[in-house]
Amino acid sequence: MASTQRAKPMEMPRISRDTARMLVNYLTYQAVCVIRDQLAETNPAGAYRLQVFSAEFSFQDGEAYLAALLNHDRELGLRVMTVREHLAEHILDYLPEMTIAQIQEANINHRRALLERLTGLGAEPSLPETEVSDRPSDSATPDDASNASHAD
């Protein structure tokens, strides 16, 4: 019987830092998307300039992206910082529960699929009853069907 694999306690701080860094990068990206969409409605030329700038810089490092944006357009950089902070304040309360629930649901689905594959269950999809009953029987021929319709 395989033992359950768990992260070692000394790995948790590193994993937490890496996760937080990734989340900050993602929130920076989302803030830029929100602002780009707002600008598209109010200032299409500004939205285009933000799109062009964003294509030149990677969101893999949100802080480097933000530093470059602040050098390029201070007002826009400050706006990204404000929106990013606002997003963080509103989603982080719900994130732990949502993340755990999604992981648990995904794990159940993966385990179910694995079990079905290992046991051979679900290998052949069954047809709904209506499709089965609408099919002509194997012994019926096209001539039988036309004769039955003209039997009146």
Curated annotation (Swiss-Prot):
One of its GO terms (cellular component) is carboxysome. Heterologous expression of 12 carboxysomal genes in E.coli (ccaA, ccmK2, ccmK3, ccmK4, ccmL, ccmM, ccmN, ccmO, ccmP, rbcL, rbcS, rbcX) leads to the formation of bodies that resemble carboxysomes, have densely packed paracrystalline arrays and RuBisCO activity. These structures open the door to generating carboxysomes in plant cells to increase their photosynthesis and productivity, as well as tailoring bacterial microcompartments to specific metabolic needs and molecule delivery. The absence of ccaA, ccmK3, ccmK4, ccmP and rbcX leads to less active RuBisCO. Residues 121-152 are annotated as: Disordered. It is found in: Carboxysome; Cytoplasm. SUPFAM superfamilies: RbcX-like (SSF158615). Induction: Transcribed at very low levels under several growth conditions; in this paper protein was never detected. Carboxysome size and components vary with growth conditions. When grown in ambient air at medium light (50 uE meter(-2) second(-1)) there are 40 units of this protein per carboxysome, which remain constant under all conditions tested (at protein level). Residues 138-152 have a biased composition (Polar residues). InterPro entries: Chaperonin_RbcX_sf, Chaperonin_RcbX, RbcX. GO terms for biological process: carbon fixation; photosynthesis; ribulose bisphosphate carboxylase complex assembly. Keywords: Bacterial microcompartment, Carbon dioxide fixation, Carboxysome, Chaperone, Cytoplasm, Photosynthesis. Disruption phenotype: Non-essential, no visible growth phenotype in ambient air or 2% CO(2), no change in RuBisCO assembly or activity. Non-essential, has a reduced growth rate in 5% CO(2), about 2-fold higher amounts of RbcL accumulate. Cells have fewer, larger carboxysomes, their positioning is often abnormal. A double raf1-rbcX deletion partially recovers carboxysome formation compared to the raf1 deletion alone. GO terms for molecular function: protein folding chaperone. The keyword Cytoplasm applies. Homodimer. Interacts with the exposed C-terminal peptide of RbcL via its central cleft, contacts a second RbcL monomer via its peripheral polar surface. An RbcL-specific chaperone. The central cleft of the RbcX homodimer (RbcX2) binds the C-terminus of an RbcL monomer, stabilizing the C-terminus and probably preventing its reassociation with chaperonin GroEL-ES. At the same time the peripheral region of RbcX2 binds a second RbcL monomer, bridging the RbcL homodimers in the correct orientation. The RbcX2(2)-bound RbcL dimers then assemble into the RbcL8 core (RbcL8-(RbcX2)8). RbcS binding triggers the release of RbcX2. Colocalizes with RuBisCO throughout carboxysome formation, suggesting it plays a role in caboxysome biogenesis; may also be involved in RuBisCO holoenzyme stabilization or adjusting its packing in carboxysomes. Belongs to the RbcX family. Unlike most cyanobacteria, in PCC 7942 this gene is not encoded in the rbcL-rbcS operon. The homodimer has 2 functional domains, a central cleft essential for production of soluble RbcL in which the RbcL peptide binds, and a polar surface which plays a role in correct RbcL subunit arrangement. This is RuBisCO chaperone RbcX. It comes from Synechococcus elongatus (strain ATCC 33912 / PCC 7942 / FACHB-805). The gene is rbcX.
